[in-house]
Regions:
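Conserved class I S-adenosyl-L-methionine
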Residues: 1-42
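Conserved SAM-binding loop of SAM-dependent methyltransferases across substrates and taxa
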Residues: 55-66
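C-terminal alpha-helical "lid/dimerization" subdomain adjacent to the S-adenosyl-L-methionine
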Residues: 146-190
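Conserved beta-strand signature within the Rossmann-like core of class I S-adenosyl-L-methionine
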Residues: 138-146
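A short SAM/SAH-binding and catalytic strip from SAM-dependent methyltransferases
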Residues: 113-125
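Conserved SAM/SAH-binding beta-strand->alpha-helix loop
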Residues: 76
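Conserved SAM-binding loop
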Residues: 83-84
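A short glycine-rich, Lys/Arg-flanked "PGG" loop and its adjoining helix->strand segment in the class I
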Residues: 128-139
Length: 215
């Protein structure tokens, strides 16, 4: 396990995420959509690995839907502390664990279900993240990612460029964090190369793709 960073740019958003999760079960509507999609495949009795888990709302929700156990990793130590707190509040702390770690460099434990919610867009290069997460995945692999194709993909790239100017101007807060728009088709091809078949592929909130695979 890697040493905990002193501070992560995501720390500033943790309190808002927790507030929303306490009210609605999950911090974001997209997370709820991914949880519903995974529930549709079947979470009962399965183990789950949530990479870039944030405050753990997806993994905790999976336990509520019947998953046997779950584990989450995130770069933000504040988010991990919040995830542990929420798991305790929801009465599932004995079946879930959260650790600070980078999924692109950490040795990941195997799990039946591996999920990456709004994670690929935080990495300049997703090859290592794909390699490690796919190696850990048993029967289900799922992710959400910004659209990269067509007019929406162009819009996303423009929006990301504007956001990255803001992040650079606030380097003291965000460090080297940037938003990246990756080729969704290339990621889909990489996942299929590991023997997964696409079960669900849909657009959410206009600019996001949600994908669930099984093998």
């Amino acid at each position: 396990m890697e040493a905990e960073p002193e501070r992560c740019c995501f720390d500033d958003w943790v309190d808002d995420w927790v507030q929303h999760a306490r009210k609605k079960g999950v911090a974001r509507e997209l997370t709820g959509s991914l949880l519903d999609a995974l529930d549709g495949v079947g979470l009962g009795g399965r183990t789950m690995l949530d990479l870039g888990c944030g405050i753990g709302d997806l993994a905790i929700g999976a336990l509520d839907r019947g998953a046997a156990s779950a584990r989450g990793y995130d770069l933000s130590s504040k988010a991990i502390s919040a995830a542990r707190m929420l798991a305790d509040e929801r009465g599932v702390a004995d079946r879930i664990s959260f650790d600070v770690g980078d999924a692109a460099t950490t040795d990941l434990p195997p799990a039946d279900v591996v999920a990456l919610n709004r994670v690929f867009c935080c990495y300049p290069d997703v090859r290592s993240l794909l390699d490690r997460s796919l190696a850990a995945a048993g029967s289900v692999y799922a992710f959400t990612i910004p659209s990269s194709n067509g007019l929406i993909g162009r819009f996303e790239r423009i929006q990301a460029a504007i956001a990255n100017v803001w992040y650079r101007l606030r380097r003291r807060t965000f460090g080297d964090f940037r938003v990246y728009i990756h080729d969704v088709d290339a990621i889909d091809e990489r996942v299929r190369a590991e023997g997964f078949r696409l079960l669900r592929w849909e657009r959410r909130r206009v600019v996001w793709h949600l994908a669930v695979y099984e093998r």
